[in-house]
Curated annotation (Swiss-Prot):
Family membership noted in the UniProt record: Belongs to the venom Kunitz-type family. Sea anemone type 2 potassium channel toxin subfamily.
GO terms under cellular component: extracellular space; nematocyst
Alphabetical list of InterPro entries matching this protein: Kunitz_BPTI, Kunitz_BPTI_sf, Prtase_inh_Kunz-CS, TFPI/VKTCI-like
Sample GO molecular function, one term: potassium channel regulator activity
SS bond list: 11-61, 20-44, 36-57
Residues under site feature: Reactive bond: 21-22
Function: Serine protease inhibitor that inhibits both tissue and plasma kallikreins. Has hemolytic activity. Inhibits voltage-gated potassium channels (Kv).
Gene3D superfamilies the record matches: Pancreatic trypsin inhibitor Kunitz domain
SUPFAM superfamilies: BPTI-like
Pfam families: Kunitz_BPTI
Endpoints of the signal sequence: 1-6
Record protein name field: U-actitoxin-Avd3r
Length: 72
């Protein structure tokens, strides 16, 4: 079954850290867990599944935040 209906196609791209070696904290949508998760972005290349904040990722990818625990 195709569960990708109604979701932004950028959110279905695999997580891509890019070719550079910086470590910028970013978020991507994990289509397996259906959640936005943190990763370290290298700073160049990569793809569109790359968001500056958890909130932005959840908004664009339509994640229903059901009282998700805040990261400390």
């Amino acid at each position: 079954a195709d569960v990708s209906y109604g979701i932004n196609k950028d959110c279905l791209l695999p997580m891509d850290v890019g070719r550079c070696r910086a470590k910028f904290p970013r978020y991507y949508y994990n289509s397996s867990s259906r959640r936005c998760e943190k990763f370290n972005y290298g700073g160049c290349r990569g793809n569109a599944n790359n968001f500056h904040t958890l909130e932005e990722c959840e908004k664009v990818c339509g994640v229903r935040s059901r009282d998700s625990p805040k990261e400390n």
